[in-house]
Amino acid sequence: MAVVTMRELLDAGVHFGHQTRRWNPKMRRFIFTDRNGIYIIDLQQTLTYIDEAYEFVKETVAHGGNILFVGTKKQAQEAVANEAERVGMPYVNHRWLGGMLTNFQTVSKRLARMKELQAMDAAEDGYQGRTKKEILLLNREREKLERVLGGIADMTKVPSAMWVVDTNKEHIAVSEAKKLGIPVVAILDTNCDPDEVQYPVPGNDDAIRSANLLTSIISSAVEEGRKARAERQAAAAKDAAGDTGKSEADAEAVKAEAAAEEKAETTEA
C-alpha cells in the first residue's frame, strides 16, 4: 500500500512552490512547471522521495534510533508538536536554541533546571519560605524553559535523525546536524538548498495542510519502525528462551548419561 497518494498531495497543496523570483536554482530538477508566477513542484518525484524518507525513518527507529521533529514557523508548530507527541519523539516547535545539538551538555543542564522547577511547582511546600516576587520569577523561568525545551524534556542524547519543516528558517538546526553527521529529512520548497539534506521531500513548506500531511507521514514511519523494533525484540527474546531451554535439556541429558554410567559401574563392581 502506498504511503500517500497523488490526490492527497494535491488536496494538501504540496505542489505549490514559491514565486518564480524567489527560488534556488538547485531546486530546478524538482520543478514541473510554473503557473501565474508560481512554481509547481513535480509531485511524481515527491512521491518517490517520500517513499525513500519513509523507509529511512522506519529503519532508523526499528534499530533503536530516535527522530527529532523541528518546525518553529507558525504553519508547522501544531503539526510538529502533535505528531511528535503521538509517537513519543522529541520536538522543537518554538525557538531553536543555538547549540541545542552541538552543545547538548549545556542544554542538558537547562533541562535539569526545568525539571527542578517543575518539581518545585508540583510539590505542596515547594515554594515554602519564598516571597511572592521570588515565586513569580521562578514561575516565569519555568514557563520560559518549558516553552523552548518542553518538547525535548525526555531527550537524553542527540537524535539519530531529524525531520525539518523549512530548512531556510531552521538553518541553524540543519547546520548543527550537519556538523554532527546527523541525517536530515526535510520538506524542500523551491527556495531551499537540496544539498543541505540527505533525504529531501520536495514540497510546500508554507501551507498548514501540506506541513500537516508530510509531518504525519514521517510520524507514521516512526510508528511502523517502533512496531518493527518490538517484533524484533520479541523474536530475539523467544530465540533466547529457546536456547535456554535447549541448554537446560542438554544439561539434563548429560546428567542422565553420567548417572547411567555410574550405575553401570556400580553393577559391574
Curated annotation (Swiss-Prot):
Residues 245-269 have a biased composition (Basic and acidic residues). Gene3D superfamilies: Glucose-6-phosphate isomerase like protein, domain 1 (3.40.50.10490), Helix hairpin bin (1.10.287.610). Residues 228-269 are annotated as: Disordered. One of its GO terms (molecular function) is structural constituent of ribosome. It comes from the Bacteria. Transmembrane segments: none annotated. One of its GO terms (cellular component) is cytosolic small ribosomal subunit. The keyword Ribosomal protein applies. GO terms for biological process: translation. The keyword Magnesium does not apply. Pfam families: Ribosomal_S2. Keywords: Ribonucleoprotein, Ribosomal protein. Residues 233-244 have a biased composition (Low complexity). InterPro entries: Ribosomal_uS2 (IPR001865), Ribosomal_uS2_bac/mit/plastid (IPR005706), Ribosomal_uS2_CS (IPR018130), Ribosomal_uS2_flav_dom_sf (IPR023591). Belongs to the universal ribosomal protein uS2 family. This is Small ribosomal subunit protein uS2. It comes from Corynebacterium urealyticum (strain ATCC 43042 / DSM 7109). The lineage of its organism: Bacteria, Bacillati, Actinomycetota, Actinomycetes, Mycobacteriales.
